[in-house]
Amino acid sequence: MRAPRGEEDPVSVIAYVLIQTEVGKAAQVAAEVAKIQGVVSAEDVTGPYDVIVRAEAGSVDDLGKMVVSRVQLIEGITRTLTCPVVNL
């Protein structure tokens, strides 16, 4: 699932957002997160996290705003962990 991105938005930061949800809410949460601009993919997974999101943003600040003001407000999410990609 991929949300639309404007061509004018440069990508400087890529991150994975690991999401824990209420029981039985993973598919619903993944579908809602996938609608957010900057989200490249949102997949249900098994293990300690229920949904893993790949997101792109123009800066670390923009990424933080996306997670705090958009992702974390979705009903059914109990916890998030944001992991920025680094090139070593």
Sequence positions of predicted segments:
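A compositional/biophysical signature of low hydrophobicity enriched in polar/charged and small residues
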Residues: 1-88
